[in-house]
């Protein structure tokens, strides 16, 4: 049974010792974790401490214990199972887990393996037909209970946009011939079968840009009787920012997207790692930001998210500096796990012993801020905010840069007693101009006034009436250099809404 997401009633909780017995998996990223029916979750491979991994860790759902099974089998080179690897694909059909590709060292892999989880036996499968080239960072999904569809990846020289279908009974690979427009080649994307369509989101593309587009592929099932073809989907709502290395997990009428790696900035580019939950509502066909309570996990990419009944289990990942080994639950508000106290701080147990430093912003840093409304709002919005940023907000009357900008734009200095009129004129200006007319020197004061209005609304309203209806994308930014060109229209739109209410 597929878990049912409850969009306004989900709760984050870091797993503790009462949740599991046995030895939990070592920290890693680029691994896979798949659910085998309702009984177990199987973790395979990954990368940590400059090593590629080939171990298997299994979570027994009923007994709530982690264990390492004794696997046997043989491959073409006499090995008992797949070589160490990361950034491979893993797909489940019945009790079998299928593994393809990945990377080990500087080598891209093209071997194909099956693990029978009833008897814990590996088999290297020799396919025939249109064999896919070795690759990493591909994405794949099961088609019913017999076939696998795989799209894209990176072969070490180029990004890929090919589509392959593997029949797990005959072991025949078929490259799908697609007519019409096709998505740009990519790797690090997600691919999910929804009824008769393969949905592909995001990834890193040719020349390195990170993408945020959504595509649907028809004609992948025999029942379709349709010519295979791609369609780009542009859905309403709170769409995810461009990213790669994210996870997409099915939850009834929803798809749950978590985490990933993107870039930020306008004047200069820098890496960004995400930790928000965004859902694709298949009923209303739109994106929605999932409201969650409690402090979320640190931002990360190349993690795993699996569903266990009505719960989702997050494991591992990487944030540009740290490799995580923590386990987190995302559960409905009525779940017993949701009734626990606040999540404990992220500590060194989340990472390999030779990795130091915290995530982007730790809970311990936030606790030092006491009862600051700014920090409280940031925690409720599920974002990180530096203590410096939380202390930098002043009333608009005391914002000298705001007053000086108004004088510069309108050509005269207002009398000391008319500063309110000066500020109002500037706000009217920002709510009336098109995004392409705004000047570079306006962005800093605009962003600061936008954040000031959000904080003021939070202080004047209860959390429920304020938070559940509003999403503010730029509240967490430290300065305007983190804005991108395509952020400006959205910033002006949100700013106008704040002023109108």
Swiss-Prot record:
**UniProt KW keywords:** Golgi apparatus, Kelch repeat, Protein transport, Repeat, Transport, Vacuole
Q: Where are the Kelch repeats?
A: 40-86, 96-145, 147-196, 198-247, 254-310, 312-357
This protein's record includes keyword Repeat: yes
Task: Give the observed phenotype of the deletion mutant.
Answer: Accumulation of proglutelins in seed endosperm. Mistargeting of dense vesicles (DVs) to the type II protein bodies (PBII) protein storage vacuoles and reduction of PBII size in endosperm. Formation of paramural bodies (PMBs) secretory vesicle-like structures charged with DVs in endosperm.
**UniProt region (Disordered), positions on chain:** 341-371
What Pfam families has UniProt attached to this entry?
Answer: Kelch_KLHDC2_KLHL20_DRC7
InterPro entries the record matches: Kelch-typ_b-propeller, Kelch_1
Any one GO CC term of this protein is: plant-type vacuole
State the Gene Ontology BP annotations.
Answer: intracellular protein transport
Q: What does this protein do?
A: Acts synergistically with RAB5A and VPS9A to regulate dense vesicle-mediated post-Golgi trafficking of major storage proteins in the seed endosperm during grain filling and maturation.
What protein name applies here? Protein GLUTELIN PRECURSOR ACCUMULATION 3
Question: Which organism does this sequence originate in?
Answer: Oryza sativa subsp. japonica (Rice)
């Amino acid at each position: 049974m597929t878990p049912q997401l409850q969009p306004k009633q989900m709760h984050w909780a870091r797993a503790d010792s009462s949740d599991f017995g046995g030895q939990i998996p070592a920290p890693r990223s680029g691994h896979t974790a798949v659910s085998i029916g309702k009984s177990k979750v199987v973790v395979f491979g990954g990368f940590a401490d400059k090593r590629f991994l080939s171990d298997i860790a299994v979570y027994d759902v009923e007994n709530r214990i982690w264990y390492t099974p004794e696997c046997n089998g043989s491959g073409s080179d006499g090995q008992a199972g797949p070589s160490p690897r990361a950034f491979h694909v893993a797909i489940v059909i019945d009790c079998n887990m299928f593994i393809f590709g990945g990377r080990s060292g500087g080598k891209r892999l093209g071997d194909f393996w099956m693990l029978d989880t009833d008897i814990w036996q590996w088999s290297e499968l020799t396919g025939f037909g249109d064999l896919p080239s070795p690759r990493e960072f591909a994405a794949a999904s099961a088609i019913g209970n017999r076939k696998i569809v795989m799209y894209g990846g990176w072969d070490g020289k180029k990004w890929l946009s090919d589509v392959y279908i593997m029949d797990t009974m005959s072991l025949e690979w078929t490259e799908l011939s697609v007519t019409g427009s096709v998505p740009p080649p990519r790797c690090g994307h997600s691919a999910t079968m929804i009824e008769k369509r393969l949905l592909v989101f995001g990834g890193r593309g040719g020349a390195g840009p990170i993408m945020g587009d959504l595509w649907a592929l028809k004609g992948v099932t025999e029942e379709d009787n349709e010519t295979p073809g791609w369609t780009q989907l542009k859905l309403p709502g709170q769409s995810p920012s461009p990213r790669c290395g994210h996870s997409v997990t099915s939850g009834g009428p929803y798809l749950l997207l978590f985490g990933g790696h993107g870039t930020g900035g306008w004047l200069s580019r820098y890496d960004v790692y995400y930790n928000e939950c965004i859902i694709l509502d298949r009923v209303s066909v739109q994106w929605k930001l999932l409201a969650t309570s409690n402090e979320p996990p640190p931002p990360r990419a190349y993690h795993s998210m699996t569903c266990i009944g009505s719960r989702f289990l997050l494991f591992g990942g990487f944030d540009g500096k740290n490799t995580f080994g923590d386990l987190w639950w995302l559960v409905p508000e009525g779940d017993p796990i949701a009734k626990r106290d606040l999540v404990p701080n992220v500590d060194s147990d989340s990472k390999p012993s030779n990795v130091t430093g915290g995530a982007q912003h730790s809970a311990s840093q936030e606790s030092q801020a006491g009862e600051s409304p700014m920090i409280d709002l940031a925690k409720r919005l599920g974002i990180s905010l530096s203590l410096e940023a939380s202390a930098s907000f002043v009333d608009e009357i005391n914002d000298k840069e705001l007053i000086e900008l108004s004088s510069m734009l309108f050509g005269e200095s207002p009398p000391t007693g008319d500063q309110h009129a000066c500020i109002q004129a500037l706000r009217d200006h920002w709510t009336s101009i098109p995004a392409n007319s705004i000047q570079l020197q306006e962005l800093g004061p605009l962003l600061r006034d936008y954040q000031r209005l959000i904080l003021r609304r939070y202080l004047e309203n209860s959390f429920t009436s304020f938070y559940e209806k509003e999403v503010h994308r730029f509240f967490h930014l430290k300065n305007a250099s983190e804005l991108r060109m395509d952020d400006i229209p959205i910033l002006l739109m949100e700013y106008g809404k704040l002023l109108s209410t």
